[in-house]
């Protein structure tokens, strides 16, 4: 009988030889040992492939998959295809998790939740990425509604621990070839989940670095992919029967779109991404509606007014 570990920890690896050891050490030294660590070498051009093989040779819980460079989404999907654990964690190869993470998650595993919710902290800025709502097991759509009402719903997949069979049953995978894959994956997962529970455990440490995969990406593709994800999610949300949830989700997409515009990551690419109809049709909250109307009158005016308000608050 093949032993199935409690946790599968999936780590896509690409061009992180200076950070990989800290990441892997935070995994192999977990105080709870019934885990497997799946390192997916995504065609890394540096010393990472050899490092991965060394870890696997030293610890039978470490498994390595080498594949041609295919991007973060495909690497995570590869890890999922090889995973055997009851629950799955995603860890980026330049980040770390607390050594007692799996130990502290065990009581929540016993509750058979589809998704266990955790929190993270951005090392350097000390900015905490957390969830504002605490409850017993609730349906995923209910949690989304409450979290959006509280204004606290981080989309990063690394903050959530997923029951592996739940992901399989609902065919939940990451969309290949795009940045911001979490922006689509996380809401889809929550809308499919029957039982989600918040752990209150802050376990994940984001290590921000200037040469990271995300920071170096071409900003145009970054903006375009997020824009496309917003439009795809709009189609998904419009099919929801729960009107209150639908309104909150659509409103959150308008807020995300306007934030993207405000950050200067849309308007510099011309009219292709200026989508007044989307903003006007999907704004729901009175504050968002006011912003949408101003944006519809004049996107540059919206940008200047928003900047002025930010400066006044600073």
What does each of the following model-derived ranges do?
Residues 18-21, 35, 46-55, 96, ...:
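Acidic helix N-cap motif at the loop->helix transition within catalytic regions
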Residues 26, 33, 41-51, 68-70:
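A conserved acidic beta->alpha catalytic loop
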Residues 67-83:
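Glycine-rich, basic loop-to-helix element that forms the pyrophosphate-binding segment
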Residues 203-210, 216-244, 265-282:
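Catalytic core of nucleotide-sugar-dependent glycosyltransferases
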Residues 72, 93-197, 207-219:
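Donor-binding/catalytic cores of nucleotide-activated saccharide
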Residues 1-29:
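N-proximal low-complexity "stem/linker" segments adjacent to membrane-targeting elements
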Residues 88:
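Short aromatic/hydrophobic "clamp" motif used to bind/position activated sugar donors
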Residues 266-314:
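Membrane-interface aromatic/basic loop that binds lipid-linked glycans or pyrophosphate carriers
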């Amino acid at each position: 009988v093949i032993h199935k570990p409690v946790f599968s920890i999936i780590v896509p690896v690409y061009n992180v030889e200076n950070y990989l050891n800290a990441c892997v050490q935070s995994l192999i030294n977990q105080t709870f040992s019934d885990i497997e660590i799946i390192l997916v070498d995504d065609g890394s051009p540096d010393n990472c492939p050899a490092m991965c093989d060394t870890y696997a040779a030293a610890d039978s819980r470490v498994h390595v998959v080498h594949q041609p460079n295919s991007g973060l989404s495909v690497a995570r999907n590869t890890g999922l295809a090889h995973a055997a654990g009851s629950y799955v964690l995603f860890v980026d190869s330049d980040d770390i998790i607390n050594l007692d993470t799996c130990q502290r998650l065990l009581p929540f595993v016993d509750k058979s939740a589809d998704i266990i919710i955790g929190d993270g902290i951005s090392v350097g800025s000390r900015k905490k990425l957390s969830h504002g709502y605490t409850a017993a097991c609730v349906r995923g759509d209910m949690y989304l509604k409450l979290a959006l009402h509280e204004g606290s719903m981080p989309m990063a997949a690394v903050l959530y621990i997923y029951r592996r069979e739940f992901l399989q049953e609902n065919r939940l995978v990451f969309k290949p070839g795009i940045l911001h894959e979490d922006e689509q994956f996380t809401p889809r997962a929550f809308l499919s989940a029957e039982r989600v529970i918040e752990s209150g455990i802050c376990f994940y440490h984001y290590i921000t670095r200037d040469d990271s995969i995300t920071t170096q990406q071409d900003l145009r593709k970054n903006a375009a992919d997020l824009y496309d994800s917003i439009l795809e999610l709009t189609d998904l949300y419009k099919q929801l029967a729960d009107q209150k949830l639908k309104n909150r989700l659509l409103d959150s997409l308008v807020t995300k779109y306007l934030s993207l515009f405000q950050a200067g990551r849309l308007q510099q690419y011309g009219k292709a991404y200026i989508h007044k109809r989307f903003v006007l049709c999907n704004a729901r909250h009175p504050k968002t509606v006011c912003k949408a109307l101003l944006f519809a009158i004049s996107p540059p005016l919206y940008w200047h007014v928003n900047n002025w308000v930010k400066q006044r608050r600073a």
